Amino acid sequence: MAIVLIDPESQIAMDAVTGAVAEWSEDVVTLDVMPLYEKVEELEQYVNDMMRAMDPSTTTWGTLPGREGVHETAGFLTNFAHGFVIGTMIVALVAFTLAAVYKLHALRLLGL
């Protein structure tokens, strides 16, 4: 924390970072909050990244350039694969059910 003494006799000092002018005394403890501000800014970047993650057309903070829309593509392919698997299972269930019904019908016609 940089402090500039404006007038040592009347003990007036200026904070070089904020530009605040105040009375200065040696018995007052000062705290450098700039590292705290840096951590808060880093946390804000993480929060903004989490908010951007909700939008599928954007990319996250640490990704390589040119990956815009990758979440939309991944979501489409995932939903397509799930739909294909579930649709195949339903068609197989219907086919096996119809085969069983026709087999029972054929056995009844044969008298077995």
From Swiss-Prot:
Disulfide bridge positions per record: none
UniProt subcellular location: Cell membrane
Highest taxon of source: Archaea
GO term, biological process aspect, one: methanogenesis, from carbon dioxide
Molecular function terms, GO-annotated: tetrahydromethanopterin S-methyltransferase activity
Keyword Cell membrane: yes
EC number(s) from the headed UniProt entry: 7.2.1.4
Enzyme class: translocase
Substrates-to-products reaction catalysed: 5-methyl-5,6,7,8-tetrahydromethanopterin + coenzyme M + 2 Na(+)(in) = 5,6,7,8-tetrahydromethanopterin + methyl-coenzyme M + 2 Na(+)(out)
Keywords in alphabetical order: Cell membrane, Membrane, Methanogenesis, Methyltransferase, One-carbon metabolism, Transferase, Translocase, Transmembrane, Transmembrane helix
A GO CC term attached to the entry: plasma membrane
UniProt-listed InterPro entries: MtrB_MeTrfase (IPR008690)
Biological or metabolic pathway of the protein: One-carbon metabolism; methanogenesis from CO(2); methyl-coenzyme M from 5,10-methylene-5,6,7,8-tetrahydromethanopterin: step 2/2
Pfam families reported in the protein's UniProt record: MtrB
Membrane topology note: Single-pass membrane protein
TM ranges: 80-100
Record's keyword annotation contains Metal-binding: no
Function noted in UniProt: Part of a complex that catalyzes the formation of methyl-coenzyme M and tetrahydromethanopterin from coenzyme M and methyl-tetrahydromethanopterin. This is an energy-conserving, sodium-ion translocating step.
Database matches in NCBIfam families: methano_MtrB, PRK00965.1
Subunit relationships: The complex is composed of 8 subunits; MtrA, MtrB, MtrC, MtrD, MtrE, MtrF, MtrG and MtrH.
UniProt family annotation: Belongs to the MtrB family.
Name listed for the protein in its UniProt record: Tetrahydromethanopterin S-methyltransferase subunit B
Gene name as annotated: mtrB
